[in-house]
A protein has these predicted regions:
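Proteins enriched for Cys/Gly/acidic motifs involved in redox and nucleic-acid/cofactor modification
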Residues: 1-162, 167-170, 218, 240-248, ...
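Short, flexible active-site loop motifs that bind/organize anionic cofactors or intermediates
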Residues: 14-17, 65, 134, 195, ...
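Residue-level recognition of specific faces of alpha-helices
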Residues: 30, 112-113, 192, 229-232, ...
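Conserved SAM/AdoMet-binding glycine-rich loop
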Residues: 43-44, 52-53, 152-271
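A short acidic, helix-capping loop that chelates divalent metal ions and anchors anionic groups
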Residues: 227-232, 298-305
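Contiguous mid-protein beta-loop-alpha structural module that forms a pocket-lining wall or clamp
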Residues: 269, 285-286
Length: 329
């Protein structure tokens, strides 16, 4: 991208986030600040918030152009000449292919990331991401292997597979992992981004058992330890599934450690239901916690549910973070 945009020193590209309403607000705040500091610059806004709410950004006088997530892959085409339209955002669900590109910028590090898929077919009630990224689109296996080969030739020792919903890789996530490990037997460390507990099958457990170069830390997107809250979130696992999964992995890899994302104060969550999350952390042996107080996101079903007071959400998040700090005790 830097090569494509070389010579355009007066261009500012803002890649926005839409995960929460607060993230979107901060994006708008950043755009205003950039305009004040760069009055003559051309400001192009793209990314997830631009895809979900293009009109909000187009109405900002500080913004010159709004591009959707698909259009940003061809950003040089849209900024090379003046355009009559200020907003160019296509329907993200109309795209069924994945743009091939190698993620760069890992110079000086041991670990590099390879994105294996984009989008998500699930509709968790708190999440706007599918409307920003579209449905699941998997990168061709040959392209993934090519990228890994190139990164290994550059001297990287750790490869981390990532994606919006990496476990939904088609035709098979476990099959892809097996192919990578068979193709690169001397790969020092294969790691994973966030993993969906509902999608990890016995084939994956067997791979963890067989290949010592699978990194023994596994990060799951659990979100809650209460089955009713999980159901209202439209998650596909139960607390029992999580406990069993951790036990299975630990049985074949005693050195395994686990981390997870958790949302505290999801709509309708009671004190007892929150306590089930606290208990799950201990029962499953989860030691690295990414804890977030629930944040309403307009356009999601959860935003229409009865809300937990903000101060209660923050207090529960504080309690769970403290629990995480003592997990290794």
């Amino acid at each position: 991208l830097k090569e494509k945009l070389s010579g355009l020193d007066n261009l500012i590209i803002v890649n926005t986030c839409a995960v929460t309403g607060e993230a979107e607000r901060q994006c708008r705040q950043t755009i205003r600040k950039l305009r004040r500091e760069n009055p003559d610059a051309r400001i192009v806004v793209t990314g997830c918030a631009a895809q979900v709410a293009p009109q909000k950004f187009a109405e900002m006088p500080e913004v010159d152009l709004v591009l959707g997530n698909r259009e940003k892959a061809e950003i040089e085409k849209y900024i090379s000449a003046p355009l009559e339209e200020k907003t160019i955002v296509g329907d993200i669900f109309n795209y069924d292919s994945y743009d091939k590109y190698l993620i760069t910028g890992f110079e000086g590090r041991q670990r590099a990331f390879v994105q294996i898929q984009q989008g998500c077919n699930h509709r968790c009630t708190y999440c706007i991401v599918p409307y920003a990224r579209g449905n699941n689109r998997s990168v061709a296996e040959d392209e993934i292997l090519r990228q890994i080969r190139e990164l290994l030739e550059q001297g990287f020792e750790e490869i981390c597979l990532t994606g919006v919903d990496a476990c939904s890789y088609q035709p098979s996530f476990s099959g892809l992992v097996r192919k990578i490990l068979e193709t690169f037997p001397h790969l020092p460390s294969l790691q994973f981004g966030s993993l969906d507990p509902a999608a990890l099958d016995d084939d994956f457990i067997e791979l963890v058992k067989k290949y010592a170069n699978i990194h023994p830390h596994f990060h799951f997107s659990i979100q809650s330890g209460d089955n009713m809250i999980l159901k209202r979130m439209k998650r596909r696992h139960t607390r029992e599934d999580v406990i069993n999964l951790c036990a299975k992995i630990r049985a074949v890899r005693p050195d395994a450690t686990f981390g997870s994302d958790f949302i505290c104060g999801f709509p309708t969550e009671t004190d007892e239901q929150f306590q089930n999350t606290v208990n799950l952390v201990r029962e499953a042996g989860i030691t690295r916690l990414h804890v977030f107080p629930y944040s309403e996101r307009s356009g999601t079903p959860a935003a229409l549910m009865p809300q937990v007071p903000v101060e209660v959400r923050r207090e529960r998040a504080r309690i769970l973070r403290e629990q995480g700090e003592h997990c290794d005790d």
